[in-house]
């Protein structure tokens, strides 16, 4: 009877240890789910921001293009009257537009890299979540074996 009681105590202690592990795994799982949710929300925000920013920049660029086309038509109509100085000023304007568009392209590229980084972070969090879930499943399977 003492041996049976000792075996019972050992099994009970193992059960308590397993329950403690499950509790810790559940807490880890909850934290990882929260991190996954946060990363998903950040990714959605970044994607929305990039899309809105790209639309806004496209609209600005289209307006710039329309203005440039209008200036070009006016310049062609007055091409015989335009002085060397005015041609130089127009060239400066185009260079500024190129610099501006180049800067905008760099900004969009940086934002895309941030989206890529957030997607990578989201994938890593999903893999952590899967590992914890697998470990929890294994612990439950081990408990079922007792």
UniProtKB/Swiss-Prot annotation:
InterPro entries named in the record: Phage_BhlA/UviB, Tropomyosin
Paired cysteines (S-S): none
Pfam family, one: Holin_BhlA
Parts forming coiled coils: 1-146
Similarity-based family: Belongs to the tropomyosin family.
Function description: Tropomyosin, in association with the troponin complex, plays a central role in the calcium dependent regulation of muscle contraction.
Entry comment, domain topic: The molecule is in a coiled coil structure that is formed by 2 polypeptide chains. The sequence exhibits a prominent seven-residues periodicity.
Name of the protein this chain belongs to: Tropomyosin
Annotated organism of origin: Turbo cornutus
